Amino acid sequence: MKRGALLVPFVPLALACVDPGDSNHSCASVFSVSSAAAASFCATFTVSAVTETTGVPAALLSNCDYKTKHLSSACSCLGPATAAAPTQTSAVTPTVAPTTLKANAVAPTTEAPAPTKSSTFAGNGGTTCTVTEYAAISSAVASCSNILLSDVYAPPSSTIDLQNLQTGAAVIFAGTTTFGDTPDDDFDPIVISGTDVTITGADGHVIDGNGAAYWDGKGSNGGSSKPDHFIVAKHMYYSRIENLNIQNWPVHCFDIEHTENLIISGITLDNSAGDAPNSASGSKPAAHNSDGFDIKSSTNLTLQNSWVHNQDDCVAVSSGTDIVVDNMYCYGGHGLSIGSIGGKSDNTVDGVTFSNSQVINSSNGCRIKSNSGTTGEVSNIRYENITVSGITDYGIDIQQDYLNGGPTGKPTNGVKIENITFVDVTGTMSDGKDYYILCGDGSCSNFVFENVGITGGSGDSCNYPTDTCLEA
């Protein structure tokens, strides 16, 4: 949706209804931003017939706290003057690739205006601010409970800094968010912190990481300087990141650390443009080390209902406790991973479940990796209902000889790996080995395999539980 072009006008009825923002800070704002979807929805979703949320556009449903009373109030308060016939819209379906995302950078003006404020669409009793220029972000963060970032261009060396959000604040990305070139390994384009905050996207938005400006086939292993982490989510508590469309990040996409009770849902990560070689990468894919979600030192985290096309780990948990990764679609990368573990400030992973997910055309399916010559602990890990296909290296891979430059072939036993369960893990290989387990002396224990069947590889290689791999 273009700035300033509301497809369907909204008529506030402030005296005749209940403000939907009383209990949920972003509900009213998203009805304003996603006006076309709201118009179609409200045409049939009436106050007198609010019985279910089937068919509700994903952005409206999530920003209205999944409560029909908020949806009803929003339709009453912000009801469209006219409405098109309703259409069915579902949440992100990981098994279907998204349409191609496109980005057009918007050049910054010499002087940025202050954010436009509106009390009509205020959430949580606060103010909604629409930001169209980078320079207005800091004042919006300081003064607004709801922030709409519309077609924002971040100049070189300029972070979209969302670290000081008000408690309960909501940030909505709209239009196309773009970034200038910043060849700096320590530069983070987006940083988010806060308590009870919601980070979400309006219908049709794109966050473009300008990856093509940096890709050289080496990622963080050398070559030119490039931002190592695109989005840093740290010290987020009881918060949500949802319904974001992100493409073309330089190296690692999400760096998630020191969070508690964080829900990440409905994310589309499309780095498919990095599959092709360029002049700097030779015959290799231009993008490298392009992890989707790196999770560290976090507790009670849920990552769900998301789609990833990249060139490295789809998800990598290197430390943390009580983490659920559910309903993921992973294409082209290195699979669903624990690790690498060892040699870091936090080397403990306990209580991680990967479930109901697909790993397609990737080098690995399910992987646990510990760094050679280091210490740590990996325990209570469960892979359940995982389907793999087109895997080129290992269907199930547990190895204790890992190094970023390549495995040593000689496992060490400083990292303990115990209570590991695989249930209903099935699929096919296009090359490589179905199962590869290389444990250090006495460092692996209590592995369980139930209804595990991966076929098509050139054989297996295991030294635990036995040399016949899955037999205890």
UniProtKB/Swiss-Prot annotation:
Q: Which cysteines link up through disulfide bonds? A: 129-144, 314-330, 439-444, 462-469
Question: What is a GO molecular function of this protein?
Answer: polygalacturonase activity
Spans of the PbH1 repeats are 236-258, 259-297, 298-319, 349-370, 378-400, 412-433, 444-467
Record's function text:
Involved in maceration and soft-rotting of plant tissue. Hydrolyzes the 1,4-alpha glycosidic bonds of de-esterified pectate in the smooth region of the plant cell wall.
Major location category of this protein: secreted
Q: What is this protein called?
A: Probable endopolygalacturonase D
Instruction: Write out the GO cellular component annotations.
Output: extracellular region
UniProt keywords, alphabetically = Cell wall biogenesis/degradation, Disulfide bond, Glycoprotein, Glycosidase, Hydrolase, Repeat, Secreted, Signal
The record lists the organism as Neosartorya fischeri (strain ATCC 1020 / DSM 3700 / CBS 544.65 / FGSC A1164 / JCM 1740 / NRRL 181 / WB 181)
As recorded in UniProt, its EC number(s) are 3.2.1.15
Question: Where is the protein localized?
Answer: Secreted
List the active site: 312, 334
The residue range of the signal peptide is: 1-16
Q: Which family does it belong to?
A: Belongs to the glycosyl hydrolase 28 family.
Entry keyword annotation includes Disulfide bond? yes
Which domain of life, per UniProt? Eukaryota
Attached carbohydrates are found at 24, 300, 361, 385, 419
The UniProt catalytic activity note for this protein reads:
(1,4-alpha-D-galacturonosyl)n+m + H2O = (1,4-alpha-D-galacturonosyl)n + (1,4-alpha-D-galacturonosyl)m
Q: Does the keyword Hydrolase apply?
A: yes
Gene Ontology BP term (one): cell wall organization
